[in-house]
């Protein structure tokens, strides 16, 4: 399951506060961040997710996306997790780009805490395996550096995202780059670099499913 983070339109419906799990309440969804040049996160994640889906399908994988287009509203973060749960997804990858400090660059991976009450038995442990494999493989395939502002490129014990909190199986979020950094913004806007990012995600997921 690939989850292209955020959506195009920011209407009152996505500002509704929902229970995002683990005691977290937040907006149903948002439009995300953007580069200083105006390239939006939702467009980046949609493009990368579709590129990764094509690569995975070429390898024979069955791939679902949590939203059908880049022109609508939603779905809510709660619904995105539900889509993965109902599909009994072997892995749930939430694809994002960060809006971090302008002086920071690189990617990082977010993983749930061991005590996540929503995961199936072993799901949290498998999420940590998925996070480690994606962290190492994405770096090796893309050559992109680990985040300079998130230690080691890991955000452990994350409870800030609804998809991580509410997913039952292996789940991570990958923040592929920092859109507020000029160098990373140039990568985000380059189709060839987005293809490289998709290849890194594909390789990480394939490696995890082979473990």
Region roles according to the model:
Residues 39-211:
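Active-site-proximal helix/loop segments of hydrolytic enzymes
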């Amino acid at each position: 399951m690939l989850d292209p983070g955020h959506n195009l339109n920011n209407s009152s419906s996505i500002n509704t506060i929902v229970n995002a799990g683990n005691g977290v309440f937040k907006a149903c969804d948002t439009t995300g961040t953007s580069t200083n040049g105006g390239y939006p996160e939702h467009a980046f994640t949609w493009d990368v997710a579709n590129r990764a889906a094509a690569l995975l399908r070429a390898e024979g994988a069955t791939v679902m996306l949590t939203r059908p287009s880049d022109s609508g509203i939603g779905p809510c973060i709660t619904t995105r997790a539900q889509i993965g749960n109902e599909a009994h997804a072997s892995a749930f990858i939430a694809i994002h780009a960060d809006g971090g400090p302008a002086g920071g660059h690189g990617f990082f991976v977010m993983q749930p805490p061991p005590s996540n009450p929503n995961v199936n038995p072993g799901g949290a442990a498998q999420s940590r395996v998925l996070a480690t494999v994606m962290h190492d493989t994405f770096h090796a395939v893309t050559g992109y550096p680990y985040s300079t502002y998130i230690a080691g490129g890991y955000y452990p014990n994350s409870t800030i995202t609804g998809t991580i909190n509410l997913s039952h199986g292996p789940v991570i979020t990958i923040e592929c780059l920092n859109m507020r950094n000029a160098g990373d913004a140039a990568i985000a806007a380059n189709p060839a670099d987005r293809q490289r990012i998709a290849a890194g995600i594909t390789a990480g997921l394939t490696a995890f499913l082979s473990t």
